[in-house]
From Swiss-Prot:
It catalyses: RNA(n) + a ribonucleoside 5'-triphosphate = RNA(n+1) + diphosphate. The gene is rpoC. It is an enzyme of class 2 (transferase). Its cofactor is Mg(2+); Zn(2+). DNA-dependent RNA polymerase catalyzes the transcription of DNA into RNA using the four ribonucleoside triphosphates as substrates. This is DNA-directed RNA polymerase subunit beta'. Pfam families: RNA_pol_Rpb1_1, RNA_pol_Rpb1_2, RNA_pol_Rpb1_3, RNA_pol_Rpb1_4, RNA_pol_Rpb1_5. The keyword Cell membrane does not apply. Mg(2+) binds at D465, D467, D469. InterPro entries: DNA-dir_RpoC_beta_prime (IPR045867), DNA-dir_RpoC_beta_prime_bact (IPR012754), RNA_pol_asu (IPR000722), RNA_pol_N (IPR006592), RNA_pol_Rpb1_1 (IPR007080), RNA_pol_Rpb1_3 (IPR007066), RNA_pol_Rpb1_3_sf (IPR042102), RNA_pol_Rpb1_4 (IPR007083). It comes from Acinetobacter baumannii (strain ATCC 17978 / DSM 105126 / CIP 53.77 / LMG 1025 / NCDC KC755 / 5377). Zn(2+) 1 binds at C75, C77, C90, C93. GO terms for cellular component: DNA-directed RNA polymerase complex.
Amino acid sequence: MKDLLDIMRKKTDSDGHAPVEFDRIRIGLASPEMIKSWSHGEVKKPETINYRTFKPERDGLFCAKIFGPVKDYECLCGKYKRMKYKGVICEKCGVEVTTAKVRRERMGHIELASPVAHIWFLKSLPSRIGLLLDMTLRDIERVLYFESYVVTDPGMTPFEKYQLLNDEEYFTALEEHGDEFVAKMGAEAVQDLLKDIDLEAEISRLREEIPQTTSETKLKKASKRLKLMEAFKDSNNKPEWMVMNVLPVLPPDLRPLVPLEGGRFATSDLNDLYRRVINRNNRLKRLLDLAAPDIIVRNEKRMLQESVDALLDNGRRGRAITGSNKRPLKSLADMIKGKQGRFRQNLLGKRVDYSGRSVITVGPTLRLHQCGLPKKMALELFKPFIFAKLQASGQATTIKAAKKMVERETPEVWDVLASVIRQHPVMLNRAPTLHRLGLQAFEPILIEGKAIRLHPLVCAAFNADFDGDQMAVHVPLTLEAQLEARALMMSTNNILSPANGEPIIVPSQDVVLGLYYITRDAVNAKGEGMVFADTHEVNRALATGQVAIHARVKVRVHQTVINENGEREQQTIIVDTTPGRCLLWEVVPEGLSFDMINLEMTKKNISKLINSCYRKLGLKDTVIFADQLMYLGFRQATRSGVSVGMEDMLIPPTKHTIIDKAETEVREIEQQFEQGFVTAGERYNKVVDIWARTNDQVAKAMMDNLSYTLVKNKQGEDEKQKSFNSIYMMSDSGARGSAAQIRQLAGMRGLMAKPDGSIIETPIKANFREGLTVLQYFISTHGARKGLADTALKTANSGYLTRRLVDVAQDLVITEPDCGTSGGLVMTPFIQGGDVIEPLRDRVLGRVTAEDVRRASDDEVVLPRGTLIDEKIAAQLEEAGVDEVKVRSVIACESTFGVCAKCYGRDLARGHLVNPGESVGVMAAQSIGEPGTQLTMRTFHVGGAASRTSAANSVQVRNKGTVRFHNVKTVQHAKGHLVSVSRSGEIGIADELGRERERYKLPYGASILLKDGELVEAGGIVATWDPHTHPLVTEVAGKARFSQIADGVTATSKTDDATGMTTVEILPVTARPASGKDLRPAIVLDTTDGGEQFYFLPQNTIVTVRDGETIGVGDVIGRVPQESSRTRDITGGLPRVADLFEARKPKEHAILAEVSGIVSFGKETKGKNRLVITPDDGSEIYEELIPKWRQINVFEGEHVNRGETISDGPQNPHDILRLKGEVALTNYIVNEVQDVYRLQGVKINDKHIEVIVRQMLRKVDIIDGGDTSFIKGEQVDYIRVVQENQAVLAQNKFPAKFERQLMGITKASLSTDSFISAASFQETTRVLTEAAVTGKEDDLRGLKENVVVGRLIPAGTGLAYHLERRRQEAEAAEHALHNDFSEVDQAFSQALNSEQF
């Protein structure tokens, strides 16, 4: 390993040597010798520069003798000047004659008069010095800051090593024992103790000790110490180097002193901190020379320690040292951490030359790959190219002349500019760049004016609009950069969105409106019923006004269709269409059929059209087509004359009657409230309900009124036709506006919310057309302001989420074609509440099959494994009736670094199998983060009013089909129907092909009316249940007998006034008298065969049978009312996504069964129930204490499976991973994240979420090391463990046992192998301290590390460079081996020859 400083020096060799290539960077502790080897001399004085001459003081902090000359090739006293004396050292002032920039790299040093502990290794938790010495941080600090003595060598005295003595104890001991023992204080003492540690002996002692340790805390501490000691042993770091004897001094140009006008100076804080250290150090030296009293020396040493602490990390210990203006000084640690630190400000984000920015305006005449660049800007950006061209063509003799010409802007300069710009792409960027489409390349077209012109179709990708947005322009300089910009970043190559694989170059707003307008049809328009020979004839008729653009006519069209085999066929057909659609047909490329455009072109339809064009005809045709669509749309929107007027907002005539009716209902409820029939809460809920319903009714009336008009047709009868109302057309086409907005314009504004989120019960009955009263306006202002405040918060939070995601996934790159695994995820259609939300074809599209796909009906192989599923195959799968496919997934990928192409599948932005080197991690992070700002920030309070949907109480099917049970356990009731006794059962409905169309959850105790495999008609009811109670269902028949159910002790009888029926209700434990506290009420069934079955009754159970009654199988013997679910906050939107990715444990999460077995309840403790599970396999009994207020869903004697829910609540992802495995966890996280995005209508491919989950599952906890090198309790990379276990198994030894760990994204980012990446993310100090102590090597495998060290990244086109480096490295290693052997051979033969036998 070379020293980093040598590398830096090599880079700056003026002889033009190539920079040193390196493959890894190691960080470690610097020994005093090493610090001196870097140094060019000792800084002895605190002076900086002479304030009159501005020359640096000798031996001071800016000394030219140590750090180098201030001016290029000129010594300080001026004896030697110019290049010819290069390398001469002036005998007068001692300065070497060289370039001044060595002052940026030459370091100095300070010889400390007393050792000083490095604050990072002392105070950065856990304290490394403390761990090594096995002392507490407080004790060490007392020694370091001269409060106590520590025994470093006890000799023959009763003291122990590491024992602390205060002054009195020390002097008493001195009197008693004299110099038989040694005790010291300060950093010297700590340094001696560290020197004395025998790492080898300690390590072997700890290795023996760990297996015998019983206490958990001791074990943790011992294994931590062991890890640290081994790290020291392996890394060639010595523990005593954590205490410094020599302090390095930063090169002066990195802590500059700049003279300001008025004789003052601006200086870096570091100079103040160094001055403080030097002053105290010099004073200490003087005191030691004078043999000053101990107490004074001690104080000086303590002050020296404190000043070095402040220099390294100001404010970590005690109060931060402040400058003259009461602001804490910026120390070395502050220089590198945080957003303004070295990492994030200068290494990961740099400013670039050859860039400019300006306002953007719309460029409707541009082609998709073009942008308009103002001439002024282009002239400045392309200057070097222009200079070179002017010189080459002989128009200017020198660069200076060329410069003059450009400044004068002579005519020939413009000609040169035009030729330079031809075919030279520029990159446009709009901040915030949330995904890779925020930076795209275009060909510049020179324009007058000062604004950049942007093609309207790329606005969606940039999220740009023309209300004053600015964009930046960057010029790719090298040929390679130009090539990449053209081949990869050109806007024409980015038609599909990387997030979901759908077109992102889709017309919006005016274009959509124009296309929609010309493809509408109208009843009885001019020329209806005409027949045309071809589209040209239609054009002529339109131009001469013979036919209206919306008329219904017949036209003969020629179309080219691509058949099954990919061949093109010509067809001629006669179609019913309109002249407007014929206009559109003229721009549609060959290969698309006419019926794709023979309909109203809403935004959705246009998107579909572009998508199928891309899939069928490829990139080039799509780009041309998109441009043509845009030109046509703009032109026709202009000609349509669609505008917005007051008259367009039609208020429905029935509005007032609907509102009057609602007001009457509200009055009735008010009366009921006054008479005491309903409570205040109920009244409020009902009123809010009524108004919400009324608002919907008004909106419906308004939309009906707005969307249809009555017209006379040719026969003179009235016919309904879609309205040509401007506002309605805008909304219907998807150009602008939504039903909700039109409702506010022409319906009623409806209910408003108060600042705390509660709804104000009096709605705004007016709409914007009628106008609002002052009060109504005032009520509505709150929502508007909250919206603005929310947006600001949301942007920050969303950005932070994206940053964490990028950081955790940045090193995931496609590294190999196929890892060969057969693991993966089983994909089924995503069904929720009976609706197919995402069909199977959408979920498997672009994935690779993990095993053969077989048809459900005859088990025939439809698709072999390893096939990439495209649109065609997905359609075939659907036809074959396949309803689950096992596909490869990044979760199961077995590549060591990165993932393989087969596990990832299709590259969504390109539409084919992903290329090696594609940076899929960053793509995933951007795809999830980019829509973040569209998500809501609020947490919803779900209370009475908001949970408007009535609880489901039956399964009613929508489609005819066959009933399928999914893990449903049932018992047969006497009346003939089945009763469900399983908790996680589901019912599916399959169509005639065997594809599942619907799926419903089936609660415990539901009555099932059909059997598995029976047919059901559409609308048939399959199962019913009571949504408000939990039934207790008997699984055997017998006679009921009450046990420990005593009135007034454990139960209470209630008689219903209305019905006169008496019911027995079990009392809660808290409400029972003392005698009933320990009783466990139960119903015992004496079965017919003489056995007994106990049913223990939870608190609040309503018993529905009488003592001695005969009971059949499946009867309900008791009901537990479900607490009207407590108002609980549902976290929605962005915070929910963040919670999922941070793997946070939810409050009051669901309790799952840890093992499979029979449930029973043990002895209760105060406030908690004891749940006992007796496992099926006879292993040890599992017990858990559950708080009494938790509702427990299982009953005594019931059988549960591992991972089944015992008590409801939000799921805890860690439990899912532990009990159900990583596939179940992946499905849970993917579905939960998708729920949030779906609610906002954002489409993200599952793949992206899986990529992040893979990174969250990187680490495992070692439970038992076996014969591997891992220690129990250690955290290791999953892939590493798997590989080491395979190696160990091959030798027939014991592999390590481990448990997968789920880490939140922040923690996962920090636990990455690369310390550079972790340090530049968060907690810089902690990461660097840990890395330095353990002597970590960074292999520079991720993207971030390589950006920081300034190399090409190992992704995309940079991957080739890295693979080549790796290959060379492997070859060099092999070569070295051969060399060693040949040398040994030579030596051996020489020895043989020299011996005289």
